[in-house]
């Protein structure tokens, strides 16, 4: 019985390895190769050790399923967050090697609840909920997301792992654990990377036809899938999806 349970855990990914077995230091540096460019305000901030420490605080992140599923989640996470923090074309490697250039939205300063960190955490409610989840008072100290790299990554992974309202978690979508409801099907929200864009910024980017923001998110994702040697899957855009606020 014990051996049977262990075998089942192995198959389902619940007995998964450390995220660092997929994202090595060399891979991290290859994916985010221009993050420490002199033109990047975030130079020196986003470190491999901070990412691993944060990732290991969230069971299931990058450890769910087989190696293909795990790599696909890592590619999707860094694809979305690289768009949120992009510095554009910083080298001959092109625009999809320019992620993690910024920490603060518009390089702002001060204590407001503007976008910070890899996911550009925004709004007092998100700062409050994220802070409760990771054990930090981010309402009274929101700039901790821009000054402590581990906290910064933790807020991004918290957002990634957490369902809110009628939105599934990004994690459940990319790992195949989300089943669209009738309302989702009616809104053309099908499993794939495009729904994750809808979760993150659907009100601005989705259901409006082809646009450069969604193209940029897909471009980052495709680059990381290539580096990780994994297929990106179907339904990459949200051009024809209604956003979740429209139900």
Swiss-Prot record:
Active site: 84
Chain coiled-coil ranges: none
One GO MF term attached to the UniProt entry: endochitinase activity
Record keyword DNA-binding present: no
Taxonomic superkingdom: Eukaryota
Disulfide bridge positions per record: 206-238
InterPro entries, A to Z: Glyco_hydro_19 (IPR016283), Glyco_hydro_19_cat (IPR000726), Lysozyme-like_dom_sf (IPR023346)
Main location: secreted
Family per similarity comment: Belongs to the glycosyl hydrolase 19 family. Chitinase class II subfamily.
Function per UniProt: Defense against chitin-containing fungal pathogens.
Protein name: Acidic 27 kDa endochitinase
Source species: Solanum lycopersicum (Tomato)
Record gene name: CHI17
């Amino acid at each position: 019985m014990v051996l049977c349970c262990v075998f089942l855990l192995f198959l389902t990914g619940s007995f998964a390895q450390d995220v660092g077995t997929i994202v090595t230091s060399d891979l991290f540096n290859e994916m985010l190769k221009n993050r420490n460019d002199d033109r990047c305000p975030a130079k020196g901030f986003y470190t491999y050790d901070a990412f691993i420490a944060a990732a290991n605080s969230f069971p299931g992140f990058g450890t769910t399923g087989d190696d293909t599923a795990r790599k696909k989640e890592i590619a999707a996470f860094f694809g979305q967050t690289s768009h949120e923090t992009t510095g554009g074309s910083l080298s001959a490697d092109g625009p999809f090697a320019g992620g993690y250039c910024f920490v603060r939205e518009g390089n702002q300063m001060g204590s407001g609840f503007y976008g910070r960190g890899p996911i550009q955490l925004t709004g007092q409610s998100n700062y409050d909920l994220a802070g409760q989840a990771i054990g930090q008072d981010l309402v009274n100290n929101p700039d901790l997301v821009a000054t402590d790299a581990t906290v910064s990554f933790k807020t991004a992974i918290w957002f990634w792992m957490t369902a809110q309202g009628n939105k599934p978690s990004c994690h459940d979508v990319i790992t195949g654990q989300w089943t669209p409801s009738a309302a989702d099907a009616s809104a053309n929200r099908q499993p794939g990377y495009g729904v994750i864009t809808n979760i993150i910024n659907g009100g601005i980017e989705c259901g409006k036809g082809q646009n450069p923001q969604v193209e940029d998110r897909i471009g980052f994702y495709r680059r990381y899938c290539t580096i990780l040697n994994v297929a990106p899957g179907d339904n990459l855009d949200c051009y024809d999806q209604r956003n979740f606020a429209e139900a």
